[in-house]
Structure formats: structure tokens, C-alpha cells
Amino acid sequence: MPIVDELEVKLLHPDAALPARTRPGDAGYDLRCVEPFVLRPGERALVPTGLAVALPPGLAGLVLPRSGLAHRHGVTCANSPGLIDPNYRGELRVVLVNLGRDTYRGHAGDRIAQLLLVPYWAPELRVVDELPDSERGEAGFGSSGR
């Protein structure tokens, strides 16, 4: 598992804010938007953060919804989690969707999502004729009951 003490962040916009954790024990870094936006019910928008990052090899970024925004307004990340590969150097943008009943107005500087850094592995894939048995087997959706 990669251990890093610093993450390189490039500010692409004069109003961009460094991602920040609200409390010392928080896992996610809040991402803020740099422009106002309006989301009518059912609409999606690609919202800029004004940031780019250089993730080290072995770490990926997951863009996750903010629970309060989803609970209070029905606004969440449409492709949650959004994946940031370590070789991506472009602007971090968040696909927000309004699942609520009311129009949502975002303001520059609002916290719109969270960035979670996670280790990943990329093993070589091998095609097999049979998979090993498991206790669950092929039991899928709804198989564990209510």
C-alpha cells in the first residue's frame, strides 16, 4: 500500500480552494466549486473545481457525494464514485445531479463533493474454464434476504 505524506495539487483558477478535511479524523477531502451553477430537478451539470492533482502510482481518487447535500437537497454525484486515475492531470470536475423536487443553486466556494484517496492493485488477468467454488456460489441479487 502506498504511503504518501504530500499530494501535489495545482490551482487552475484564482478562486480555487485547496481540498480540505473538516475534522482531523475525516477520510475525505471536501471539493469546492469555482463557479455558480443551477440544477433544476432531474438535471445534471459538470461542475468545475479549479483543481488538478498528481496522484502517485498505486493511489486512485474517488469522488463521492456529500451526505448533507444529498439529504437536504437531493443533489448527489451522478457517477458515484467518480474515479480519478493516477495518470490524469486535468481539472477535477464533478458530475452533479438534482434528484430533488426543487431547483438547487450552487455558489462559488460551495462544498460539492469529497475526494477519497484509495490504494488499488492492477493484477494481470487470466482466463480460466472454471472458477473455484465458494459458499455463496452464483446466488446474486436478493439472495441474502431482507
Can you annotate each of these PLM segments?
Residues 1-146:
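DUTPase catalytic domain/fold
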